[in-house]
Amino acid sequence: MTNIEEIGARARAAGRRMALMPTERKNAALEAIATALIDEANAAEVLAANAIDVAAGRDAGLSPALIDRMTLTPQRLAAIAADTRAVARLPDPVGERFDATVLENGLRVHKRRVPLGVVGVIYEARPNVTVDVAALCLKSGNAAILRGGKEITRSCAALTRLIQNAITQTGLPADAIQVIDDPDRALVEQLLRLDRYVDVIIPRGGAGLHRFCREKATIPVITGGIGVCHIYVDQAADLEMVVPIVHNAKVQRPSVCNALDTLLVHRAVAADVLPAVARDLLASNVELRADEAALAILRDAGFDTPQIVPAQESDFGVEFMALILSIRVVSGLDEALDHIARFGDHSDAIITRDAATAEVFVQAVDSSAVFVNASTRFNDGGQLGLGAEIAISTQKLHARGPMALRELTSYKWVVEGDGHVRA
């Protein structure tokens, strides 16, 4: 039987050691993990465990898309190894000194970046997350307790054994990365209440998982990765930009959190924009759910296809994660901002040549990332120059947007004196 208290205690002890690990040793551990992932014997063990999970998933009637996310191959293991090596090459944030000053009384003060401590990560049927999270937590000096979806229990256990064997060879504690491999859901609730040992919980999955964690946790929870993404096409838009940006945001990877869900178009340019957008997206099998004004424009332009349907009010505010796009014609910037304020918080973009309008949009939209003349798909740690990410936070505390190495740290005040006493 899995003892969550014991796992937590071991993680806390390992976290104290990890906080003191030099960068060179952490990097060596990541290189060892990467090497192990492409070692023939290790890979065979992981792939065998994964094959059992995948077969069970097929027998349970899981969707082809979910089966694909669950599946590991030698090529995917090689890609995970490459990603792990990329984390090793990133700058180590731990120990960074900033906001240094000397006070009038001569005290020397600075902030020093430190690991969060023990990070609990709960995720669904993506075994690659096991290694991604381990790499980021180790590099940032944290310990981690992992709980993957019940569909990938064997895969997660095999990957964790590989990680533990690799890191102990370089002097890191095996307990720095632990996995809860018992599918009992009650153990998740126990983890969410393990505030004696765990410093933060990061869920990676659907809205139901995020809600469950927020409701049950006695530990701070950083949620994100879910949200409705918008593009607003302004009356001053460069029309040549519109189709490529909308296509990229909607079609490139429709099942991810930074994919476009709703297109808002200024009525002054709607008759020019919508037919061009529709032609492009229909060719990629996108279903368009158009409001009354947008539907009229498309009908007048000769579009008559079951792929274009009248939008219901419920189609706005939906994260589709599929080849579906809702479209609304708006009277101008103010209406677009009101719509985004109601439904947005993840990734929202404006297409315009008017710098003043763009600045109003950037200031007014309260989302984790705001884009001007660029696709929402750039809300990603790698794309924003941060390297890998553990999640994309839509919260305002403690982190917002892509959570990379720096976001897995906090800081402490360091005060140095020369026998100072307070008057």
From Swiss-Prot:
GO biological process, one term: L-proline biosynthetic process
Gene Ontology MF terms in the entry: glutamate-5-semialdehyde dehydrogenase activity; NADP binding
Superkingdom: Bacteria
One Gene Ontology cellular component: cytoplasm
Alphabetical keyword list: Amino-acid biosynthesis, Cytoplasm, NADP, Oxidoreductase, Proline biosynthesis
Record Gene3D superfamilies: Aldehyde Dehydrogenase, Chain A, domain 1, Aldehyde Dehydrogenase, Chain A, domain 2
Reactions catalysed: L-glutamate 5-semialdehyde + phosphate + NADP(+) = L-glutamyl 5-phosphate + NADPH + H(+)
InterPro entries (alphabetical): Ald_DH/histidinol_DH, Ald_DH_C, Ald_DH_N, Aldehyde_DH_dom, Glu-5-SA_DH, GPR_dom
Involved pathway(s): Amino-acid biosynthesis; L-proline biosynthesis; L-glutamate 5-semialdehyde from L-glutamate: step 2/2
Pfam families according to UniProt: Aldedh
E.C. numbers: 1.2.1.41
Primary localization class, coarse: cytoplasm
Localization (cell): Cytoplasm
Protein's UniProt keywords contain Oxidoreductase: yes
SUPFAM superfamilies documented for this protein: ALDH-like
Function: Catalyzes the NADPH-dependent reduction of L-glutamate 5-phosphate into L-glutamate 5-semialdehyde and phosphate. The product spontaneously undergoes cyclization to form 1-pyrroline-5-carboxylate.
NCBIfam families on file: PRK00197.1, proA
Family note: Belongs to the gamma-glutamyl phosphate reductase family.
This protein's name: Gamma-glutamyl phosphate reductase
Organism per entry: Roseiflexus sp. (strain RS-1)
